[in-house]
Each structure stands twice: as structure tokens, then as C-alpha cells.
Amino acid sequence: MKIETIKYRKERKMRLIIVRHGDPNYEIDSLTEKGWREAEFLSVRMEKQLQKEHTYIYTSPLGRAKDTAYLTLKKLGMTATEFKWLREFEAPAIDEDTGTYKVCWDLLPARWTSEPAYYDKDQWMNTPFMKKAKADTESAWVYDGLDSLLKKHGYTRENGYYRAEHANRDTIVLFCHFGVECVMLGHLLGISPVVLWHGTAAAPSSVTTLYTEERREGIASFRMQSFGDLSHLYAADEPASFAARFCETYDNMAERHD
């Protein structure tokens, strides 16, 4: 397999890179054989793209995220800091439509689209389902964790933007999970995570990149340059995993149903 066809440039700018773990084996909280291949192709990309001396890597405490990070860390000769708030977003509740426990990102379209609050960045956690799931407490924990990390790197949250108290060109890499990724993106971009959970799919090993913009001195915001990028898989002729998606047509029993 050829995995050098895409040339990645090592850039010096303030970046926040969010990496979803490789194809998961949830039974053992690790990766499938395919997931390990994805992690290897990802590590080749990361080695080419990152400057070790300006890169800081953080991981979820869950095995599938740490295993995905392992090969990148090995190639770079680095270690990662583990944060509990980077674990998968835990806010399940009984779904009225099915009578079973559902995670926040698996609600049926007819359910979540009928409640205007789900589209609101400040009200999405106040719907009956999200209240039962205690999504307000869980999301506040993630918001606080992310803001504390960014403050450590020189950016302090103020209203909907960040004060650039020490503007810099660090690269922050977070190895984590789709659910918590959307919560962080919602916080940074001012979007309800419910819209992101149900309207996007960051496939396993995908890379999402955000940059800071400081158009006025001391006032910074984040802009997403790419979401769910899989160029490292395309370069290696490795197909994307179907994980995080449901059946494209109801009659296709080979694809995920609920």
C-alpha cells in the first residue's frame, strides 16, 4: 500500500486537532484489526504533519482512544496527558419512542427535529430527554475541561470568544470520541451539539482541525478548517468505517439499524 501520495506540510500556527479513535471493538474497549490499520496510517500522517517541539497531545482515558494515540506517540517519541473529560460523552436516558436507553446522538429524526430547543446552543440540554440524561452537568464538565486546557495554552474564554492572553502557535491534539468531539465543537463554534451529532459523522480515525483567528489584538475565535478528514485512509486505499452511521436505506439489512 502506498501511503506517501499526499504530502503533509509541517505548519506553525495555533491549531486544535481532534482525532476520533480508530474502528472500535467496544467489547474490549480497543480497536478492531481495521482500527489498528487506521491508527497506523494516521500515525504516518501525524509524523509528517506535526512539529514535536510545538505539539501537545492529550487523550481520553478509554482504551480505544489511547490505542489510537499510541502509534502516533511512538513515532513522535512523545507521551500524552490523559483527561477524564475527554472520555465519551455519557448522558443516556430512556427514549420515549423505543422505551430503551439511548445516547444523545442516536435520537430519531422525527423526535429531535420537532423540538426547537435542540437547535439552540444554549437550550438544547433543557429538553425533557436531555434533562433525564443530565446532559447539562456532563456538557458543563466538558466545557470547563476544554476551557481550562485552552487557558493553559494562552486563551481564556470570555462570552463566546477567547482572550488571547498569550497568543501562540501551539498545536493541541485531542484523541477522543465522536460524541464528546461534537460537544467541544459546539462550544467553540456556537452550535448546538445535537445538530452536529445527528447531521455529521466523524468516521473512525478522522481528523478535525480548527485554527485560531485574532482579527483584533487580544480577541480570538476558532474557525474549523476541516471536519472528519480521512485523507490518510484514502492515501492508503483503506475504506472508511461505517461506524457512527445508520442504514442509508431501510431495506439494507447489511447496514446498521436500531
Question: Which residue ranges define each predicted feature?
Answer:
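Active-site-proximal alpha-helix that buttresses catalytic centers in soluble enzyme cores
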Residues: 2-87
